[in-house]
Regions:
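A residue-level marker of the well-folded mature domains of exported/periplasmic proteins
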Residues: 1-123
């Protein structure tokens, strides 16, 4: 196992993953912390011709399309930015208006997007 920093950037992740593929001949899978970096990783995987699975987080349309198209990108966990902003703003306003207790954690739903539901997924 290895950890590298693609800086959540497509072009940086492309180079990082190309190097990882060369350095690790038994590499079978990659997790990216966001779909932007994952798209760079996908380009590196496709360029290598290797069977390496890719997963990520965000649910960005480009990533969802890559999953639906049957690429090495097999899964992303979709976050819902509108809900994150709505809840965060509500908490900030509550505190501004005098609330003294704001929860340390507020769960917000996520959804796994894979080959079974990618064609029908949207935010």
């Amino acid at each position: 196992m290895d950890t590298q920093n693609g800086r959540q950037d497509r072009s940086v992740a492309l180079g990082v993953v190309e190097n990882m593929i060369q350095s690790h001949p038994n590499l079978a899978g990659i997790f990216s912390v966001n779909d932007g970096g994952a798209m760079g990783a996908l380009a590196a995987i496709q360029g290598s011709g290797r069977d390496i699975k890719l997963t990520s987080v965000d649910g960005a349309p480009e990533a969802v399309k890559a999953i639906a198209d049957g690429t090495a990108f097999i899964q992303t966990t979709a976050q819902f930015p509108r809900d994150q902003v709505r809840v965060g703003l509500g908490m900030a306003l509550a505190q501004y208006w005098g609330a003294r207790v704001v929860p340390a954690e507020v769960p917000i739903d996520v959804r796994t997007v894979d080959s079974e539901n990618a064609a029908d997924f949207s935010w």
